[in-house]
Amino acid sequence: MSVQKRERLLSGGVDPLVRVDLDMIAKDSDDTVKKQMNDFLELFKSYVESEQINWDKIGFLPAEKVVEHSSLAKVEPSKAKELLGKLVVLKLNGGLGTSMGCEGPRSLIYVRDDMTFLDLAVKQIKHLKQKYDADVPLVLMNSFNTHTETEKIKHRYENAVSIYMFEQSRFPRISKESLRPIPKDANSHHSSWYPPGHGDVYRSLLRTGLLKKFIDEGKEYLFISNIDNLGATADLEILDFLVNQKDPPEFIMEVIDRTRSDVRGGTLVNYDGKIRLLEMAQVPKDKVDEFKSVSKFKIFNTNNLWVNLKAIDRLLSKDKIHMEVIVNQKAAPGGSGLIIQLETAAGAAMKNFDRAIGMKVPRSRFLPVKTTSDLLLMMSNLYIVTDNGSLMMNPKRGFTTVPLVKLGDKNFQKVKDFLDRFQNIPNMLELDHLTVSGDVTFGTNITLKGTVIIIANDEERIDIPSGTVLENKIVSGNMRILDH
């Protein structure tokens, strides 16, 4: 935002017009829309009043602010039921599968053994019920993009687990030029709206009444994670650490060692004496390379968050949950100028909570699936599905590093095209690196070892025959297998 535009807003030049626009949107609408427009106005004010991060104020976290998961005490199985009775699990289910060519919710993509992300999430909760006789509520925070489709299949799970779902806020996109809302009323086309990021989870829990319900039922902690993180399961050691400390942290963010593949993700820093999540979008342009340094910023936010429910309620009642505004700029539908989405991240709220800490966990608790390259890894024999519904590295691999997989261009981007190109998933137990580009197909019972690079030239095709073993090979050019 330019200095002149910010000064104009702060002096009241545009803000009254924004308020009028929001009042028009809320006119003749229900209380939910009115509340959401008020919440958006508060977010808009935060955006206007926000100041660029002062890089000189960023420092390293004191050692006591990051606890090693390996230092936690093991939990006796006899204590599990009582501990789990204090827990609510919430999965963030607002995303579509567009990055993998799917139109519906990402959570309904089939991942492994004919199970979707949502099936695996339910399996995790069902396991707790079967093993420990613990009824842990599963809550799904949907967006307006995913709510209807997810609601249609809710009945499949209702006999297995206690499942709740709600639709997070729907906020108006704004014009980058005028900073005024795009929609004219509450019924404007869906392209005029956006879900404002997972930082909306706290206010949405309050608005839906679920926060009060769970507190009244004696629940104490909320475990939040992305539904496409197949390693994010309820962890008894972390829960025990929270419940049985004298002065427990009100907020724990699970972090892992940062690698070069994680450099765009958030990290934890000491800012003005407080623990804070620092995201790439907040970094000054001239400091981006420094931010990407894994030797300087060594930990990475998994977005697995443990939060005290009463603390959420206390802070919301005093309007004390403040989060940095993330500005997401996009081309307007139809290509007519640029629009802005104002978003917040759930992890950014940690600075508001007492005794907030990071907890360094094994990388096995962070198995996200964002692309078909990730999907290939999860579908392969590199991982096995455990009884508790999580994926773990196959013990037969012998070492814990995950292969680097790059499935290039449009031939593999969409799930349907990706599946059409594999008659079955190759044996990848000894794979280190796989790059595939161009028109390439794979037969059955293929084994990939070491570094394998397969590049089909333009207008040519490579068919990898069934039974092939490729170890430290580069395959290029044209290789067709035709029916006789």
Task: Please tell me what each predicted stretch does.
Residues 1-85, 240-484:
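Left-handed beta-helix
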Residues 1-91, 99-106, 110-221, 430, ...:
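Conserved N-terminal catalytic core of the sugar/cofactor nucleotidyltransferase
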Residues 89, 111, 118, 143, ...:
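Active-site-proximal structural scaffolding
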Residues 93-94, 227, 309, 372:
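Residues immediately flanking
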Residues 94-97, 101, 197, 266, ...:
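Glycine-centered flexibility sites
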Residues 101, 105, 113-116, 235, ...:
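Short capping/connector residues at structural and topological boundaries
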Residues 137-146, 227-230, 363-367, 371:
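Conserved short loop/turn motifs at secondary-structure junctions
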Residues 148-320:
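Conserved core of the sugar-phosphate nucleotidyltransferase
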